[in-house]
């Protein structure tokens, strides 16, 4: 009986873990959002445009399947794999 109960507990834990999804910040002032399936990387990039010197960089945050490539107009780029790590 104990073996059956232990087996059920293990199966339940494994099944719950398979359904886990990442949560990331979508904007600097937002609450965390659940990422779509397959997008388990949080990112945050600060990008400069023509108005960067007067108002600062444009911040973009969210969920991605792969980390974006760093570009010359990025001030910074962060990719991470833990919940809400892109603050």
UniProtKB/Swiss-Prot annotation:
Keywords: Acetylcholine receptor inhibiting toxin, Disulfide bond, Ion channel impairing toxin, Neurotoxin, Postsynaptic neurotoxin, Secreted, Signal, Toxin. Residues 1-21 form the signal peptide. It comes from the Eukaryota. It is found in: Secreted. One of its GO terms (molecular function) is toxin activity. Homodimer and heterodimer with kappa 2-bungarotoxin; non-covalently-linked. Belongs to the three-finger toxin family. Long-chain subfamily. Kappa-neurotoxin sub-subfamily. This is Kappa-3-bungarotoxin. It comes from Bungarus multicinctus. The lineage of its organism: Eukaryota, Metazoa, Chordata, Craniata, Vertebrata.
